A protein has these predicted regions:
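Active-site helix-to-loop segments that bind/position phosphate- or nucleotide-bearing substrates
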Residues: 1-164
Length: 164
């Protein structure tokens, strides 16, 4: 339980940090967001979409703005909820993180636990609109809906994510 209070204290006192992560909680979030980013990037590329042209994030050299746009609705239901559950269940301890001048990172043992948890979460079912899909399938479906909007110039083909 000490680990939970440590993380919640850090979460309340400090805002989330970007790269590099400076504490265990942000390290877990950062790793999850990076993995989710790659999951969405592979779907965007598989659909033949241009990952660097988005609609919410500013277009910047070398930044896949579309992927950043599409990741937003998945952060809380996937990564944030998973990390909070891991903290609540004390799945990782403070000594499973390595902190140095470049940031705070999961050690190999922690990465193994984290990756297993992440993959289990992506394989778990959720209520995606009218059907049940795994999170991985739901991400694929949402990317397809976005592609349909682009191909048919019809915004009504895309529904914002609402998981129940």
């Amino acid at each position: 339980m000490d680990f939970l209070f440590y993380f919640l204290f850090k979460l309340i006192i400090q805002s989330t940090t970007k790269m590099p992560p400076r504490d265990p909680f942000n390290s877990m979030l950062s790793l999850g967001y990076s993995m989710l980013f790659n999951e969405i990037m592979s779907n965007v590329l598989a659909l033949g979409l241009h990952p660097y042209v988005g609609f919410m994030h500013r277009i910047a050299k070398g930044h896949p703005a579309l992927v950043s746009d599409l990741i937003e609705e998945w952060r809380a239901p996937l990564i944030d909820s998973m990390v909070l559950a891991m903290v609540k269940r004390n799945m990782l301890t403070k000594d499973m993180f390595e902190t140095n001048e470049t940031g705070c990172f999961l050690n190999p043992e922690a990465r193994k636990i984290y990756l297993q948890t992440y993959n289990k979460k992506l394989r778990s079912d959720n209520q995606y609109f009218e059907d049940k899909y795994t999170y991985r399938e739901s991400i694929r479906q949402q990317c397809r809906k976005y592609a349909s909007v682009i191909m048919h110039s019809d915004i009504t083909l895309y529904e914002p994510l609402e998981l129940r």
